Amino acid sequence: MDVEVDSILLAAHELKAPLAVLRQLALSFDGMDTANERIRSEMVSVSERAIRQVNDLTRIKRLDERLFDMEPVAVRAVCDDVVKELMYLFRFNQRDLYIKYSNRANLVIANRELLRSVVYNFLLNAMHYSGVETRSELVVKDKKDKVRIVIRDYGPALPRDVWKEMKRGWIKKPTSIAMRPGSSGLGLFIASKFSRYMNANVGAVRHRDGTSFFVELPISKQVSLF
């Protein structure tokens, strides 16, 4: 593994304990007025998102161990789970989230936790780069023998070099995305790593007013019970 990436993974592991302490500290505050309760909720939300990314980075470290089994996964249930977790954040930041499921095939071959992280990181990226009072989009649809999950934002254009890496199917390491201020590219790096592990097609489409990120997974032949 790249030395720079390895250093990032090591640093992330060291951050896990203090982030957990921060979360517990925020949860321990009681009897607050409305304004302070809002601050507390944001502290908890920020710490939980940071812990999730640390956990994702830890998973990247373990991908070579082939511990993540592939199995039939209900794609809509995964997306619903992510939306439920992030909807508060979208509303807090005055963003809308449009959701459309048109897929007939509900089961895909994937690892549930890795797929959840892919959708989570793409959606978090979309929320961050869509402007205030604009919307992000989550669309799930059939594409021949696959199911495609598309996350669309209306933010600054994705730099061409990052787009080429996504088109190739994976990002080598987190990079600063100059046209998207404040980005480390960490979420895209995580999503591309997990997608590659699952042998999923992953990529991006550049628009004049934003970017669509997608991941495609093979349809499971198992009959869905959902």
Task: Mark where each language-model region is.
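Short alpha-helical segment of the dimerization/phosphotransfer core of two-component systems
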Residues: S45-Q53
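Conserved micro-motifs of the catalytic ATP-binding
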Residues: D64-D69, L107-A110
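Conserved catalytic submotifs in the C-terminal HATPase_c
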Residues: E71, D96-N106
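Short helix-loop "hinge" at the ATP-lid/N-box region of the Bergerat-fold HATPase_c
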Residues: N125-M127
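Short conserved segment of the HATPase_c
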Residues: L158-K172
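Conserved glycine-rich
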Residues: N199-A200, A204
